[in-house]
Amino acid sequence: MGLSNKFKSFFFLDEEEEYYEEEVAREPEPMQKKTKKEKPSKNRFYAVEEEDAKVVSMQGAQFSSRMVLAEPRVYAEAQELADYLKDYKTVVVNLQRISHDQATRIVDFLSGTVYALGGDIQRVGNNIFLCTPDNVEVNGSISEMLDEQNFM
């Protein structure tokens, strides 16, 4: 039994012996190298890398440009037009077939939308408006061109 007692005492502590647990000091783990992340930018055409802070031109990238032609019949359709603008699509709105009050409300709603998005709204004809997001630039004016060519 002497061997079995030794075996027991080796693996199982006797009740008489006190058990102390020593804390092992951990060595700090080496830090992993940070990966480069792009910072969010208001301008969609440039990406700034975190570590190097270099500006990378994205002018070579192709963005699909879409234009939406809309002729809303009720004010409730204005939200759908705003969603197109949020998706960076140009919207041409023909308000000739809607009441004056409804047309005014739609223009007011779209004016607020393009202001919030940093875009622009322009009148291009009788009750026809061009709404553009911030990534579209419009030069000139149709009424100025018509005056110059004596079409009016």
From Swiss-Prot:
Residues 23-42 are annotated as: Disordered. The keyword Signal does not apply. The keyword Nucleotide-binding does not apply. Gene3D superfamilies: SepF-like protein. It is found in: Cytoplasm. GO terms for cellular component: cytoplasm. Pfam families: SepF. It comes from the Bacteria. Cell division protein that is part of the divisome complex and is recruited early to the Z-ring. Probably stimulates Z-ring formation, perhaps through the cross-linking of FtsZ protofilaments. Its function overlaps with FtsA. Belongs to the SepF family. This is Cell division protein SepF. The gene is sepF.
